[in-house]
Amino acid sequence: DAQDRWRIRWWMKFMDQWLAPSFSMFGWKYFVGPNALASHGKEKLEEAINRIPLPERQVAWRKAIYGLFSEEEMAESGRRIGVGVQMLEAELGKREWLASDQYSLADVNGFNLAYAMPLSQPHLSNDEVTPNIMRWLRAIYRRPATRECWKLGRTAMASRVEILEQD
């Protein structure tokens, strides 16, 4: 269906260009950056950054690793996440899957962005506030292919998603 294909493409672009950068900013500031510093140390990370050939990418990596985002950048990212969550919740109230009546790449992309949201931002995503998002996340998490992917992980990430195992 042409309309479904359009919606899939629209949601993919929305997530990649609107939500992903905002989720990423929060993720790097509060989780990834501090964990990278604790695991590898500043000296080792600086050596890796200095091997990046483009100076502007070095600046971007330092900003991410050290959480050097301004208050304005964090506020705008928070606003974007709030808008995105509202849009996802509304769209998922229309059908089982995000962009069509069938599981699609939009669902894969969305799950990879949003699976940790109930844990990292529970005030924005929980069973009371976003029942459609929670239903959708749990449905994707129960898929055999998703389970197999999680088994391949080498970190404790899978242990953080107990909330998705609830019904």
Model segments located where?
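A structural motif
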Residues: 42-70, 79-86
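Surface-exposed helix-capping loop/turn segments at secondary-structure junctions
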Residues: 90-102, 144-149
